[in-house]
């Protein structure tokens, strides 16, 4: 069997564009957040998303204990916030850089996000270095911004909604 090496896999994955998201939580284990593009729809009955999280990440224990999260899909122009949540910046500095509301699950919702999905984690599957978090959506909040943000070919790109 031919196994693809890690660098070849990563180079190939850079060809797949994906929305840029900040995943947040708040609860008994505290408040935390990270940037992720490994997020996708699973089903609409019941409305469910999946989020992939490295078990070695500093935020993993917080999400694992809180069992709630909010997927905040970023708009064009929010690249600095994505970089902040994707780095080693202390949590209080990450959250201080934007305005937040509290969602129905208690998780922080980014006020200027393109869309926010407030969720409960209902199943976790471990694969390799990551946990796949299956998340039932309890509430959705949309913002009227016309521009989305995607990560493609190792850089950010703005997307504009088509005129109807």
Swiss-Prot record:
SUPFAM superfamilies recorded: FMN-binding split barrel (SSF50475)
GO biological process, one term: uracil catabolic process
Keyword hit for Nucleus: no
Domain of life, per lineage: Bacteria
Gene3D superfamilies reported in the protein's UniProt record: Electron Transport, Fmn-binding Protein, Chain A
Catalyzed chemical reaction(s): FMNH2 + NAD(+) = FMN + NADH + 2 H(+)
Pfam families assigned: Flavin_Reduct
Enzyme Commission identifier(s): 1.5.1.42
Main function: Catalyzes the reduction of FMN to FMNH2 which is used to reduce pyrimidine by RutA via the Rut pathway.
HAMAP family: RutF
Family: Belongs to the non-flavoprotein flavin reductase family. RutF subfamily.
Designated name of the protein: FMN reductase (NADH) RutF
Organism, scientific name: Escherichia coli O127:H6 (strain E2348/69 / EPEC)
Classification lineage: Bacteria, Pseudomonadati, Pseudomonadota, Gammaproteobacteria, Enterobacterales
